[in-house]
Structures are given as C-alpha cells and as structure tokens.
Amino acid sequence: MTLPDPHARLRTLRESLELAARPAAEQLAALRGGAAAQLRLIHEDVAHLAPELRAAGVIDAEAFRRLGAFDRHHETLLEDERVWTDEALEQDPRWEESRSLAAAALSALGQ
C-alpha cells in the first residue's frame, strides 16, 4: 500500500486555505451553489490533514498551532446552523474571523 505524498497533501491544504482566506465576494464567486457549505469541507480538510502533515514533519509547530486555531474556530461554527448560509458568509463576523485565521495559517505555512 502506498501512502499519500505528504507534499501533495500540503499543496491541497494550501489551496484550501487560500480559498478560505479570500473575501466573501470572492468565495461566493468561486464556490457557486452553496459557498458556506463548501467551506465546511475545507474545515474537514484542515482537521484531517494538519495532524498527518505534522506527523510527517512537513509542517512545523507554529503552522500546526495556527491550523489548530482555524479548526477550533470552525468547530464552534458547526454549533450554529445559521452560519452555514451564503448570506451569513457575507455578514456574520465569525466568517471574517475564519478568513483571518486561514490567512494566519497560510502565513505560517510560508505562503
């Protein structure tokens, strides 16, 4: 059995975070038909990939910490279904916090 290439998985993580860090209007344009719901999948990517990449030595402790902050923030978002609409994506301040956390994680990844 061949394990997935950690560098390819890191690229996937970066691409996901780049999208998560974009302004709401860009997210809505890029993710037509339920952008908020699609961003939920990005959270799942981060939650699964970050520990794997840390274990593989591909990301450092600071990047892992920032990815953890993004993950914890999204865990709190999951508690409120009202936040998972495109309208909320534009208006709810918790999404702006999400974008900031994604940008910080990208920065820690050297992006």
Predicted features along the sequence, with ranges:
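Short terminal alpha-helical segments
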Residues: 1-50
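Generic structural signal of hydrophobic/aromatic residues within well-ordered alpha-helices
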Residues: 13, 42, 70-73, 105
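Secondary-structure edge/capping motif, primarily at the C-terminal ends of alpha-helices
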Residues: 20, 24-28, 53, 77-84, ...
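Solvent-exposed, non-transmembrane amphipathic alpha-helical segments
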Residues: 26, 30-33, 87-90, 94, ...
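Intrinsically disordered, low-complexity regions
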Residues: 34-35, 58, 69, 111
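Amphipathic protein-protein interaction modules
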Residues: 48-101
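Short, charged, intrinsically disordered terminal tails
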Residues: 100-111
